[in-house]
Amino acid sequence: MVDFEVLEIDVDEDEIQNEGPQEYLNRIVKSKVTAAGNKILQENLTLKPFLVADTVVSHKNKIFGKPTTKDHAHRMLKELSGTTHTVTTGIALGHISESKEIKFVQNHSHTVVEMKSLSAKEIERYVLTEEPMDKAGGYGIQGLGASFVKGIGGCYFNVVGLPIQETCLLLDDLNISYWSNKD
């Protein structure tokens, strides 16, 4: 298991007009890597590898991030109802080089999710739980939102928010063991 600590960073996650889901994720993940690396350097923190990630739901090239209000969550769920959409997570594992440069390796995971058609009552009841409020696309497959999912093609953990296999591949790239028995 990898020991970790949370490093709080702040990046602008607003969409840019005509930006597709993949371009958006690439930009946000790179911004997060840069912000984390700069914070480590500026605050003279221990030079440890750092992981950043961001997840979006997309349908017909439209990005569905986290809803900002209950009304926004309601609109998102209504639009995703009865669709097959994509959940994409961009992840990067960064580190500070000996020359104090921010370096990183990056990966993505894509999962197709088929959502059943939702009634207005189902959407309203779900939004009232407040579960949608911190989830890309306004639903959580690991919670009550699972009742809306007819099926997935790809990585379940990606839909939850962190694709484990892709994360392990990045750790392997930097020779970081994630097994409790150290190599």
Predicted regions and their residues:
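Anionic-ligand binding patches
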Residues: 18-183
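N-terminal glycine-rich phosphate-binding loop and ensuing alpha1 helix
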Residues: 1-28
